[in-house]
From Swiss-Prot:
Annotated region (Disordered), positions in chain: 1-38
Protein name: Thyroid hormone receptor alpha-A
Known role: High affinity receptor for triiodothyronine (T3).
Subunit composition and interactions: Binds to thyroid hormone receptor element (TRE) weakly as homodimers and monomers, but binds TRE with much higher affinity as heterodimers with retinoid X receptors. Can bind DNA as a heterodimer with either rxra or rxrg.
Key words, A-Z: DNA-binding, Metal-binding, Nucleus, Receptor, Transcription, Transcription regulation, Zinc, Zinc-finger
DNA-binding region: 61-135
ZnF segments: NR C4-type: 61-81, 99-123
Name of the gene encoding the protein in the UniProt record: thra-a
Length: 418
């Protein structure tokens, strides 16, 4: 090693030397021949790669004067010299390097591949540190450590972000309390719905079937059973709305439009959160457990599929009473319902509920990634269910006997925009 490095002092020697036959030896040595052409290309092509901000524009490599790419092994070098130095140390190649011209070749970006010994000696001379080159095991360990640190920083940033998310203010907590209580006092059977539900008999559907225009059949017996619970279900939605702050301040006309628009959406939500994966049923109005086909044949058709699918997806969210209540408030205060007068006021009301809702979600700290935007997508799903039901209702009204429709059911769902 010391022998190979003994010629370092001649790197700065300017004198030209002669061969024994008197011919001059050029400083830009051509001593490598074909055997030295491996490695970098003779001229490094310009690269559009990343250049650190601490480098000056076009700062040269201290070894070969090519364009530097960063601080490598304690020196500012190009990628070629960095790789050459690393390979030399990792594979312990320097003891085998030799120079045909007494170790005095000038190294630049054109000649750097022509003499490995002189290039390596210059790397050492300018200060490149051999001890900073890692062997394979150390390199793997370093990469593992870097990845572990990266994961740790991500986790710390996530925790910091969660801690920085605002939670409800005192005014919002009061609003949340009122909305939650409004839901609990108007939600049939409350948390005891599983114990108190009754399953619709599986043999229901033996009565004559009325044909629907879209090819589906309406089981009149099932339809009759559903209409028995629809009036109290609608009444509970109305009672919920009346208990909400800001709703009573709206005009009577706007209140009616909002209630008609959201009624099916809120009833669908209340049914969906009572989806039971074990029995594959929804519990309607807190008392009647029905299967998908029963609800479908009872008049809802494809709307039944949408409500059941919503129930299955909501099961993963593990919503509490407050989250269900705030979802209902957001659905109620939809300023895009046709015919509204005070749209700006209603929009501000919805924004107030949405902000309190978001802050409450921050407080709950769910483990589901992007919980808040995913939950808001359920509002869109419920709006679609409401629109599909409005279309379905027109068919039901034509095909089913009028006497089967409760007056409140007709009052709420007639004249809805499809």
């Amino acid at each position: 090693m010391d022998q190979n490095l003994s010629g370092l002092d001649c790197l700065s020697e300017p004198d030209e030397k002669r061969w024994p036959d008197g011919k001059r030896k050029r400083k830009n040595s051509q001593c490598m021949g074909k055997s030295g052409m491996s490695g970098d290309s003779l001229v490094s092509l310009p690269s559009a790669g990343y250049i650190p901000s601490y480098l000056d524009k076009d700062e040269p490599c201290v070894v070969c004067s090519d364009k530097a790419t960063g601080y490598h092994y304690r020196c500012i070098t190009c990628e070629g010299c960095k790789g050459f130095f690393r390979r030399t140390i990792q594979k312990n190649l320097h003891p085998s390097y030799s120079c045909k011209y007494d170790g005095c070749c000038i190294i630049d970006k054109i000649t750097r591949n022509q003499c490995q010994l002189c290039r390596f000696k210059k790397c050492i001379a300018v200060g490149m540190a051999m001890d900073l080159v890692l062997d394979d095991s150390k390199r793997v360990a370093k990469r593992k450590l870097i990845e572990e640190n990266r994961q740790r920083r991500r986790k710390e940033e996530m925790i910091k972000t969660l801690q920085q998310r605002p939670e409800p203010s005192s005014e919002e907590w009061e609003l949340i309390r009122i909305v939650t209580e409004a839901h609990r006092s108007t939600n049939a059977q409350g948390s005891h719905w599983k114990q108190r539900r009754k399953f619709l008999p599986e043999d229901i559907g033996q009565s004559p079937m009325a044909s629907m225009p879209d090819g589906d059949k309406v089981d009149l017996e099932a339809f009759s059973e559903f209409t028995k619970i629809i009036t109290p279900a609608i009444t509970r939605v109305v009672d919920f709305a009346k208990k909400l702050p800001m709703f009573s301040e709206l005009t009577c006309e706007d209140q009616i439009i909002l209630l008609k628009g959201c009624c099916m959406e809120i009833m669908s939500l209340r049914a969906a959160v009572r989806y039971d994966p074990d029995s594959e049923t929804l519990t309607l109005s807190g008392e009647m457990a029905v299967k998908r086909e029963q609800l479908k044949n009872g008049g809802l058709g494809v709307v039944s599929d949408a409500i059941f699918d919503l129930g299955r997806s909501l099961a993963a969210f593990n919503l509490d009473d407050t989250e269900v209540a705030l979802l209902q408030a957001v659905l109620l205060m939809s300023s895009d319902r046709t015919g509204l007068i005070c749209t700006d006021k209603i929009e501000k009301c919805q924004e107030t509920y949405l902000l309190a809702f978001e802050h409450y979600i921050n407080h709950r700290k769910h483990n589901i990634p992007h919980f808040w935007p995913k939950l808001l997508m359920k509002v869109t799903d419920l709006r679609m269910i409401g629109a599909c039901h409005a279309s379905r209702f027109l068919h039901m009204k034509v095909e089913c006997p009028t006497e089967l429709f409760p007056p409140l059911f007709l009052e709420v769902f007639e004249d809805q925009e499809v």
